[in-house]
Amino acid sequence: MNIISESLRSHPNSCALIPFITAGYPDINTTIQALYELDSQGADIIELGIPYSDALADGSVIQHSSLIALQGGTYIDQVLHILEVVSTKLNTPIIILPYYNPILKRGIEKFIKQISLMGAKGLIVPDLPLEETDELIVICNDNQIELVLFVAPTSSMKRINSISKKSPGCIYLVSSTGVTGVRDDIDIKVMELSNYIKKVSNKFIMLGFGISTPEHIKKIMKWNIDGVVVGSAFVKKLSALKIDDRISSISSLCKSLKKATIL
């Protein structure tokens, strides 16, 4: 069973809320407490980013969080530890978000087996070439990990067809060109792309990049989108000096965004 797609399927009259946080930012204890809080406040899926020094798809907020996490010693092994601590205590499935090079360095099969053993349910690799997905899909399927593939707003119809055909489950639709980060508005072209994906496939769609407010979500819910990813807005909330302030801030944000996802 594709747990991530099933989580999206379970919201026929609403839109799944998918917070993203960077593992180890600003420290591992905060990450663990944040995961518990997001779970308790209604997050439907959680993306947990593995810090990386060359995160080309990420904007300044998430790049900064990765730098701090790396300086604090958070690498793959520490992320596996976080998963081991929290996964059996959460109702919310976790998607791991690394870049491709660290996976290759560790070994694709070893990496997938490790994240599966520690409780992850999904994998998103922002810089994974479509031409190199076949091996990863097989290994993920063998280990009950759902690989989520990207569709960019610049993707041709032919490429969207190929991605939709290859995708084992849901698709991550990027809302705009460029990097992650808070934006004032979401391009209506997203609606055209989501409608096209639904026309040529039965895949569920999560939308990310630039989504940060309840108003964004209410607009997006009319566009054939099954889930919304909110990253930079959550990561910013974790920059407070006191851990209690960090957790209360992401709790409030999660509540307000969750409320917006319900029709």
UniProtKB/Swiss-Prot annotation:
Could you tell me what reaction this enzyme catalyses? (1S,2R)-1-C-(indol-3-yl)glycerol 3-phosphate + L-serine = D-glyceraldehyde 3-phosphate + L-tryptophan + H2O
Domain of life, per UniProt, equals Eukaryota
Q: Which UniProt keywords apply?
A: Amino-acid biosynthesis, Aromatic amino acid biosynthesis, Chloroplast, Lyase, Plastid, Tryptophan biosynthesis
Catalytic machinery residues = E47, D58
| InterPro entries, sorted | Aldolase_TIM (IPR013785), RibuloseP-bd_barrel (IPR011060), Trp_synthase_alpha_AS (IPR018204), Trp_synthase_suA (IPR002028)
Per its UniProt record, what CDD domains does this chain match?
A: Tryptophan_synthase_alpha (cd04724)
A single MF term (Gene Ontology): tryptophan synthase activity
Cellular component GO terms held in the UniProt record: chloroplast; cytosol
Entries under Pfam families matching the protein = Trp_syntA (PF00290)
User: What's the main place this protein lives?
Assistant: plastid
Q: In which pathway does it act?
A: Amino-acid biosynthesis; L-tryptophan biosynthesis; L-tryptophan from chorismate: step 5/5
Q: Give a yes or no for keyword Plastid in this entry.
A: yes
> Coiled-coil regions in this chain?
none
Task: Quote the SUPFAM superfamilies the UniProt record gives.
Answer: Ribulose-phoshate binding barrel
Q: Which PROSITE patterns match?
A: TRP_SYNTHASE_ALPHA
EC code(s) of this entry: 4.2.1.20
Compartments in which it is found: Plastid, Chloroplast
Q: Gene3D superfamilies, per this entry?
A: Aldolase class I
> What role is this protein assigned?
The alpha subunit is responsible for the aldol cleavage of indoleglycerol phosphate to indole and glyceraldehyde 3-phosphate.
Q: How does it assemble?
A: Tetramer of two alpha and two beta chains.
Q: Which PANTHER family match?
A: TRYPTOPHAN SYNTHASE ALPHA CHAIN, CHLOROPLASTIC, TRYPTOPHAN SYNTHASE, ALPHA CHAIN
Q: Which family does it belong to?
A: Belongs to the TrpA family.
The name under which this protein is listed is Tryptophan synthase alpha chain
Gene from which the chain derives:
trpA
